[in-house]
Amino acid sequence: MKILGVIVTPNLKWDANTDFICKKAYSKMWALRRMKVLGLDSFTLLDFYLKEVRVHLELAVPVWHSGLTVKLSADIERVQKVAISIILGQYDINYVQACTQIGLKPLFIRRQELCERFVLKTSSPTSKHSDMFQLEKNGTHSTRSKNQYREHVCLKNRFYKSPLPYLTRVLNQL
């Protein structure tokens, strides 16, 4: 089932969604290759990548980031690796060095930052969805627990990796 551009399967695995966003991003890569052949500068190519390709890889990240496997994360990173190699014109370059050279962060770091920004905006008192995260009730005693928000009891690993418990853990770590 596709909801707002995110493919949600009944078993809450994100293989289909990852395949979908990677295919969508790869379909935009032909334009990046064509622009490189036409001789556009690296700044323009990078700008195109950021505005036309990477947006597909970051759509609704807080929903599916916590459920990614290592393989799915590597599939998404591969898209950026290909884009960087096209922009730089070097196909045998180290990915992390190329990211720093071009001024980008690896996508797994970027996804984490997007989740942190989302959770901070959502938990602010002015947000319409601030009740999504419940404050911990400590009563009258002061405790050493740093958790300000109540974490969900997760009996199964699938629920532990779902968005709400993950985002609550992120919020408590900030």
Task: Give the residues covered by each predicted segment.
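Hydrophobic/basic alpha-helical segments
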Residues: M1-L174
